[in-house]
């Protein structure tokens, strides 16, 4: 028996996945079925690009449903029960400045399933997060990234 991977996420992240799953199973799946029906009406399926595209889309939707179901089934909800509010931990937002005189940036550290850097959510597996986890406000940390080392100072944790 294979042990399935755990997916660390906030309750908000799990709720979004459940909404996506509902949408995929109801609306999206039905839309694809309708596209397949319409494409069949075009005739010969051996040279029907609309039919092929609709079948490819159906495979993608079904694969995504399977993936989201697995993530929900194996979700581990991140709880902010850390006694020290100044320590960076999973589920918290951390602000830092790049040294010597960079701008302040803020990210929330979440599980990989929920990560979205464009929304300010970084994976707990990322170089930045692994360097910051367990550190406190005021600490200076060297983050090793593919682009080189970056020195930062933690300015806030919430």
Swiss-Prot record:
Residues 47-75 form a coiled coil. GO terms for biological process: DNA-templated transcription elongation; regulation of DNA-templated transcription elongation. Transmembrane segments: none annotated. The keyword Coiled coil applies. The keyword Coiled coil applies. Keywords: Coiled coil, DNA-binding, Transcription, Transcription regulation. One of its GO terms (molecular function) is DNA binding. InterPro entries: GreA/GreB_C_sf, TF_GreA/GreB_CS, Tscrpt_elong_fac_GreA, Tscrpt_elong_fac_GreA/B, Tscrpt_elong_fac_GreA/B_C, Tscrpt_elong_fac_GreA/B_fam, Tscrpt_elong_fac_GreA/B_N, Tscrpt_elong_fac_GreA/B_N_sf. Necessary for efficient RNA polymerase transcription elongation past template-encoded arresting sites. The arresting sites in DNA have the property of trapping a certain fraction of elongating RNA polymerases that pass through, resulting in locked ternary complexes. Cleavage of the nascent transcript by cleavage factors such as GreA or GreB allows the resumption of elongation from the new 3'terminus. GreA releases sequences of 2 to 3 nucleotides. NCBIfam families: greA, PRK00226.1-4. Belongs to the GreA/GreB family. This is Transcription elongation factor GreA.
């Amino acid at each position: 028996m294979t042990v399935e991977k755990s997916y660390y996420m906030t309750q908000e992240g799990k709720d979004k996945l459940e909404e996506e799953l509902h949408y995929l199973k109801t609306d999206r799946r039905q839309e694809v079925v309708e596209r397949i029906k319409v494409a069949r009406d075009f005739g010969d399926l051996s040279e029907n690009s609309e039919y092929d595209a609709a079948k490819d889309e159906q495979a993608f939707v079904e694969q995504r449903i399977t993936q989201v179901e697995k993530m929900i089934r194996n979700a581990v909800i991140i709880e902010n029960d850390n006694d020290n509010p100044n320590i960076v931990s999973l589920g918290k937002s951390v602000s830092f400045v790049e040294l010597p005189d960079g701008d302040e940036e803020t990210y929330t550290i979440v599980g990989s399933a929920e990560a979205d850097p464009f929304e300010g959510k970084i994976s707990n597996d990322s170089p930045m997060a692994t360097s910051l986890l367990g550190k406190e406000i005021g600490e200076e940390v060297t983050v090793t990234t593919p682009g080189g080392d970056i020195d930062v100072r933690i300015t806030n944790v919430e």
